[in-house]
Amino acid sequence: MAANKGMAIGIDLGTTYSCVGVFQHGKVEIIANDQGNRTTPSYVAFTDTERLIGDAAKNQVAMNPQNTVFDAKRLIGRKFNDPVVQSDMKLWPFQVINEAGKPKVMVSYKGEKKAFYPEEISSMVLTKMKETAEAFLGHNVTNAVITVPAYFNDSQRQATKDAGVIAGLNVLRIINEPTAAAIAYGLDKGSHGERHVLIFDLGGGTFDVSILTIDDGIFEVKATAGDTHLGGEDFDNRLVSHFVEEFKRKHKKDISQNKRAVRRLRTACERAKRTLSSSTQANLEIDSLYEGIDFYTSITRARFEELCADLFRGTLEPVEKSLRDAKMDKAKIHDIVLVGGSTRIPKVQKLLQDYFNGRDLNKSINPDEAVAYGAAVQAAILMGDKSEKVQDLLLLDVAPLSLGLETAGGVMTVLIKRNSTIPTKQTQIFTTYSDNQPGVLIQVYEGERAMTRDNNLLGRFDLTGIPPAPRGVPQIEVTFDIDANGILNVTAMDKSTGKANKITITNDKGRLSKEEIERMVQEAERYKAEDEGQREKIAAKNALESYAFNMKSAVGDEGLKDKISESDKKKILDKCNEVLSWLEANQLAEKDEFDHKRKELENMCNPIITKLYQSGCTGPTCTPGYTPGRAATGPTIEEVD
């Protein structure tokens, strides 16, 4: 497949599900995967024989919970000792280890212990999305726009970009999910005059509220707020806890320590939750959930709403906060846009509607697909798409957190305020604190607190060689420059000497080095080749099996009774049975072994079948077009990844 230089895709890399779209022929296509689903679970599973990504990974999670990795987005760009990582680790069935301060996921793959960075897991999901798009478009795709929550800090954005590189993508830009949804919305509406839009994005794992102004094709993010740990999974957890208690009451047994039982229960709870968005009651039927006990139960919508009442009500706090940040009254909001699968929950919609005094909510865009839709449009814009639908769109994003440096006494001096439109550049003059000070330490922080110790250190560097002078005399010009991806460059220059030093905020926060990314790219290629090898192996096994069965049924055919001697018939049947029992015992043999066995079987059967031809036989093996020695090549049914 040749790459199409002018085509770029938009990927919504979600905590629980991902989605990919492409802008072509003047409209966005959301692309279905090989299972026919327009969203793909952000799951990667490792087994003794293969690696599975997406639906195939999620479908086997109950049998293999320790080696099925999800929620990589909760780990990406974070340190191991981050409180979020520490609290989430208690809930995950897979193991997370600490390697030089960074979290890695430990799994067993092909009988060996392997540890992966979150970037590598996310890159596998991105590879799946890339392949989904390539299968649809019929050519290679390398250019992509990837979305992240508005709340992601610099290191999380950078790590997401790295994941794209490992997956073999050229990441044109990282954009905020609500911004992407606004683009989708702007295209849908063809806006006239300035409109204030509130985007309420409640997905599988994160919750974001953003306020944007759309005016004449220009999008500006006015404020963002949210909760990095609220979403559909939390509602599932409430249901799981509820049913674990119910099981205890009914059967006097605690299933909470049995990972497989909990996982099966969780799958049923997720299904019940979806049902409750359109029905007022859902039934759960799980056969042999624990110690042979069948669990049949039901739940009403009202009970579900009660179980999650505090979580649902809590979604309004970020709405209020973003309105305060944008200095806007709720009456000034023109449109309320729902994004994310969890916004289908009727109670969530009702709370939001009541808060906005009964205003209609905008549900015209499929909430699961809005973000990928907008990312696909943005990808087309960046590739210079000339379609009038996208021509007039301009995109202004914001810095999610204030950026600044430490000054005397550990004070946070802000250069770029939170919610500033990016790209942006700010310069300020600083000076020395003591006489004849030869250098200054520039320490860069992000956060909203007054003291740097309460904020997040991004990086530090020294500017040395300042000529001796009394305190307060030297002039040091510090520039903060954020590009469109939200990546920060900080420069400090001594104005008297012109001497300067700079830092690009990446590495200090645990960004992967070039070498590590290079290694991961190669490993990703290797895994892809292994996956390919696995598919070929299965094809060879199936070919051998179907050939053996075909031969058995051919020689057992009534019409051939007189045409084939008993000894020949016995020879073929014995050999076929021998091959089939070898197959039973050697399911994991190599491709070459399967091919070799088939050759062996063909060499024995071909002369006998050829003899039949020459004797002018009739029957299934003698129909025109039947080639001896060729396995049936009907559709191969196998577990797809």
Curated annotation (Swiss-Prot):
Residues 396-511 are annotated as: Substrate-binding domain (SBD). This is Heat shock 70 kDa protein 1-like. Molecular chaperone implicated in a wide variety of cellular processes, including protection of the proteome from stress, folding and transport of newly synthesized polypeptides, activation of proteolysis of misfolded proteins and the formation and dissociation of protein complexes. Plays a pivotal role in the protein quality control system, ensuring the correct folding of proteins, the re-folding of misfolded proteins and controlling the targeting of proteins for subsequent degradation. This is achieved through cycles of ATP binding, ATP hydrolysis and ADP release, mediated by co-chaperones. ATP binds at residues 14-17, 73, 204-206, 270-277, 341-344. Expressed in spermatids. It comes from the Eukaryota. One of its GO terms (biological process) is binding of sperm to zona pellucida. SUPFAM superfamilies: Actin-like ATPase domain, Heat shock protein 70kD (HSP70), C-terminal subdomain, Heat shock protein 70kD (HSP70), peptide-binding domain. One of its GO terms (molecular function) is unfolded protein binding. It comes from Mus musculus (Mouse). GO terms for cellular component: cell body; COP9 signalosome; cytosol; zona pellucida receptor complex. Residues 3-388 are annotated as: Nucleotide-binding domain (NBD). The gene is Hspa1l.
